[in-house]
Amino acid sequence: MRLSGARFALLHGSRATGRARPDSDIDVAAWWSGLAPASFEVDLPAGVDLVVLNGAPLELAGRIAVHGQLLYDDDPPCRVRWVATTRKIYFDEQPRMLRAQREFAEALRRGR
């Protein structure tokens, strides 16, 4: 990822939270300055899944900003800005996201 220009990377998912099983993949998230590649364009070993943070949905990016573990950081001011901004928006929007999830689950339960 570094060779492709990622400024920082975070471990997330089950390996970051300590709930990994032996067959769990490795979930990594990275941020690029400028034009970010698609996740499939970055050459990674088998078993490593990449989230490109530049375009990640808020629910996913927010969980990564809150629970991710830093793997490397070539641009600390950029990382701090991304984490702070993403966490703020995530926590501000969390009540709306939870309400939407409840309404969706209720609609499924009612068969609509």
Which residues does each PLM region occupy?
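Catalytic core of pol beta-like nucleotidyltransferases
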Residues: M1-F8, A16-P22, W31-R112
